Amino acid sequence: MNNTIKDFDLDLKTNKKDTATPYVGSRYLCTPGSCWKLVCFTTTVK
């Protein structure tokens, strides 16, 4: 679990703008790599 969180944080920092825009509007528009993790993480948190 720690590994996933670390990877998610790193990806989010690397593509903050890329993941922030599509994730807010359409989570399906983003790529199935870092965005997918972001959506999954956000869904779990919310």
From Swiss-Prot:
Propeptide intervals in chain numbering = 1-24
Gene Ontology MF term list: signaling receptor binding
What triggers its expression?
Induces its own expression in at least strain M25.
Q: Which GO terms describe its biological process?
A: defense response to bacterium; killing of cells of another organism
Q: How is it modified after translation?
A: Maturation of lantibiotics involves the enzymatic conversion of Thr, and Ser into dehydrated AA and the formation of thioether bonds with cysteine. This is followed by membrane translocation and cleavage of the modified precursor.
Q: Which UniProt keywords apply?
A: Antibiotic, Antimicrobial, Bacteriocin, Lantibiotic
Cellular component, GO annotation? extracellular region
Extract the InterPro entries matched here. Answer: Lantibiotic_typ-A_Bacillales
What family is this protein classified in? Answer: Belongs to the type A lantibiotic family.
Q: What else is known?
A: A longer form (streptin 2, with three more amino acids at the N-terminus) is probably due to incomplete processing. Other forms also exist, some of which are due to differing levels of dehydration.
Function in brief: Lanthionine-containing peptide antibiotic (lantibiotic) active on certain Gram-positive bacteria. The bactericidal activity of lantibiotics is based on depolarization of energized bacterial cytoplasmic membranes, initiated by the formation of aqueous transmembrane pores.
| Protein name, entry field | Lantibiotic streptin
List the source organism. Answer: Streptococcus pyogenes
| Gene this chain is encoded by | srtA
